[in-house]
Amino acid sequence: DERPELGRYTNPGGSPSVVGSFQYYLFEKYIQPAKERGAIPILVTPIVRRDLGNNYTGESGHITETVTNEEGTFQGGNYAKAIKQLGVGKSVTVLDLTTRTKDVYERLGAQGVKERHAWTSQREASIDNTHTNQYGAACNAWFIADELLKSNCNLKNYVVANPQVPQFTEA
C-alpha cells in the first residue's frame, strides 16, 4: 500500500528481493503462489484517481513523495512503474490501466469522468475520487479486455474479440 502507515506501507522503490518492498509483496504473495498452483498471473497497474485539477503526475497517478511522520520515513516512488518493472523482470504480463485511465481522464477532465465514480449522496461533493461505480468498473473491465487482447498472454484466447465499449445510462 502507498499509505505512510507502518501496518500498510510497501516501498515502491525496492526490488522483488527486498523484504518490505512493493515488488517483494506482489511477487511473494501473488505471483509466486499463482505460478505454484499452475495459474497464469497477470499484473494490472492501478487506475488513476479522479483529480479536480486534471493532474495525474502525483498521488492521483500513484506517484508518491517521501513522507516522514511520527511512525517513521516512508520512501516515495511510482507504484505503476514498480508493477511494470516487476512484470518485465519476472516475465509476467502487465496490463497498464494507469496509462489507459490517465489518457481518458486527461481528455475528458474531472467533470467528464464523474459518472464513472461512486457517489455517497446526490451532492457532487460526495464523489469518491478513488473508487468507481458499476459503470466505472465496466469501463475498467473493458480496458483490461482490450489490453489483454493486445498482449502476448495466452489468456487472450479466452477474451471475446472486439468487446463492446460500456455505455453510460442514467439510473
Task: Please state what every model-predicted region is.
Residues 1-134, 138, 142-157:
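Alpha-helical cap/lid subdomain in secreted, periplasmic
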Residues 152-171:
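N-terminal secretory targeting modules
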